[in-house]
């Protein structure tokens, strides 16, 4: 019975130890070494995370002293700063691109950039949580905490890999868009130069004509221009004449209406004054007649 218990204990310890050991993995294509600064910075973050996943004695010691989270913070900031710088560099080359396409690509790239930053932040927070749990050790053994941390790190690592690959693809599309915009700009310049060359050839051909032909051509263009100006002037004069006639008619109508209003205002007043004046004269005459003495008769 004791032998059986011993075998079971050894088997359980071996299983816990096996969970802690990370499986060997090749270097992922998303963090391959390249010439782009942001990929180099992400590669340093990735290498450091692979080292943390070993959960060696040195790793556990630095986890408890917050050394690991501090290192990850620096690597995170370097990576996101490099991504932002590379994105700004590409935006300078996207000027010839249509604004709606440029806005869409920028929005997609910004979302992928945010996801990568959130993944790295989640890794750092999980390691900080492990540090707190190890310091507290509330009802759990160190082996259990390490096994759970190893499992979480494997999941976070896969998520980080997926979002890093997505960001890499978005940046590639962004770069292709910048290249296409630059090609369109070069094509537009080429077309403009060809147009200028064609105009120069036409001017050279015109210069090579005899003086008389050039004079006739200029005279013909000048006559055409004068006729056009004369026609425009006549049309304008006719418009002015019509406008003046309309103004005259309107003024006459307004004057007649005003005269009618004045007549309507003053005729009743004049008629009333006439009646009052006639009444006044009658009253005066009556008063004068009444006050005149009758001549006395002589005997």
Swiss-Prot record:
Residues 205-273 are annotated as: Lipid-binding and lipoprotein association. The modification Phosphoserine is found at residue 141. Sequence repeats lie at residues 75-95, 96-117, 118-139, 140-161, 162-183, 184-206, 207-225, 224-242. GO terms for cellular component: chylomicron; extracellular exosome; high-density lipoprotein particle; low-density lipoprotein particle; multivesicular body, internal vesicle; very-low-density lipoprotein particle. Gene3D superfamilies: Apolipoprotein. GO terms for biological process: acylglycerol homeostasis; cholesterol efflux; cholesterol metabolic process; lipoprotein metabolic process; melanosome organization; phospholipid efflux. Its main location: secreted. The modification Methionine sulfoxide is found at residue 137. Keywords: Chylomicron, Endosome, Extracellular matrix, Glycoprotein, HDL, Heparin-binding, Lipid transport, Lipid-binding, Oxidation, Phosphoprotein, Repeat, Secreted, Signal, Transport, VLDL. It is found in: Secreted; Secreted, Extracellular space; Secreted, Extracellular space, Extracellular matrix; Extracellular vesicle. Residues 261-273 are annotated as: Specificity for association with VLDL. Residues 74-245 are annotated as: 8 X 22 AA approximate tandem repeats. It comes from the Eukaryota. GO terms for molecular function: cholesterol transfer activity; heparin binding; phosphatidylcholine-sterol O-acyltransferase activator activity; phospholipid binding. PANTHER family: APOLIPOPROTEIN (PTHR18976), APOLIPOPROTEIN E (PTHR18976:SF2). APOE is an apolipoprotein, a protein associating with lipid particles, that mainly functions in lipoprotein-mediated lipid transport between organs via the plasma and interstitial fluids. APOE is a core component of plasma lipoproteins and is involved in their production, conversion and clearance. Apolipoproteins are amphipathic molecules that interact both with lipids of the lipoprotein particle core and the aqueous environment of the plasma. Belongs to the apolipoprotein A1/A4/E family. This is Apolipoprotein E. It comes from Ctenomys sociabilis (Social tuco-tuco).
């Amino acid at each position: 019975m004791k032998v059986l218990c011993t075998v079971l204990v050894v088997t359980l310890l071996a299983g816990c130890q096996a969970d802690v050991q990370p499986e060997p993995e090749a270097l992922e294509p998303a963090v391959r070494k390249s010439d782009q600064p942001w990929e180099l910075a992400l590669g340093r973050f990735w290498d450091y995370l692979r080292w943390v996943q070993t959960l060696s004695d040195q790793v556990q010691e630095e986890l408890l002293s917050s050394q690991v989270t501090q290192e990850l913070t620096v690597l995170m900031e370097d990576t996101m700063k490099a991504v932002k710088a590379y994105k700004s560099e590409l935006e300078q080359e996207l000027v010839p691109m249509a604004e709606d396409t440029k806005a869409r690509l920028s929005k997609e790239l910004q979302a992928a950039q945010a996801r990568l930053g959130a993944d790295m932040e989640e890794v750092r927070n999980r390691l900080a949580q492990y540090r707190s749990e190890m310091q507290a050790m509330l009802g759990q053994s160190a082996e259990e905490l390490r096994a759970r941390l190893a499992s979480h790190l494997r999941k976070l690592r896969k998520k980080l890999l997926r979002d890093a690959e997505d960001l890499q693809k978005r940046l590639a599309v962004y770069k292709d868009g910048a290249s296409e915009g630059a090609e369109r700009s070069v094509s537009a310049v080429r077309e403009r130069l060809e147009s200028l060359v064609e105009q120069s050839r036409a001017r050279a051909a015109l210069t090579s004509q005899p003086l008389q032909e050039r004079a006739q051509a200029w005279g013909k263009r000048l006559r055409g221009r004068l006729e056009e100006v004369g026609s425009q002037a006549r049309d304008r004069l006719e418009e002015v004449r019509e406008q003046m006639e309309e103004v005259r008619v309107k003024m006459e109508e307004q004057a007649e209406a005003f005269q009618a209003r004045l007549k309507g205002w003053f005729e009743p007043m004049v008629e009333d004054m006439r009646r009052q004046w006639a009444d006044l004269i009658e009253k005066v005459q009556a008063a004068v007649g009444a006050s005149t003495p009758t001549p006395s008769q002589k005997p």
